[in-house]
Amino acid sequence: FKTAQIYEYETDPNNLIPTIDKFSRYKKNGDGTYTAKNKLANRCWKLQHANVITWDGLVVPCCFDKDATHQLGNLKMQSFKEIWHNENYKHFRTELMKSRKNIDICANCSEGVSVWKD
């Protein structure tokens, strides 16, 4: 199964979060807000193995960067090998290993976490 990623999950203004806890990556807090159900480790398999190349040649970390806000490089200007070793990529890797939860696309990601808890 894949769980739905909700952009505004803290308040869920469109009521998109599943009501059955088992099928949600979010948990409801006592004050009515939501948080991610699981703790994020400061590592990511996708960053190393599942980059995304957008229609216009931009390289982004993964499929969670739907709006290409974390551009690591542009294949029209560099080879993938050059992008893999450039400063943007190195900086993103470093930030992820320091605090994955502080990167917007990573804070709302289910990679490496167990969502399906009974």
Regions found by a protein language model. Name each.
Residues 1-83, 87-98, 111-118:
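Radical SAM enzyme [4Fe-4S]-AdoMet core and its adjacent flexible, acidic
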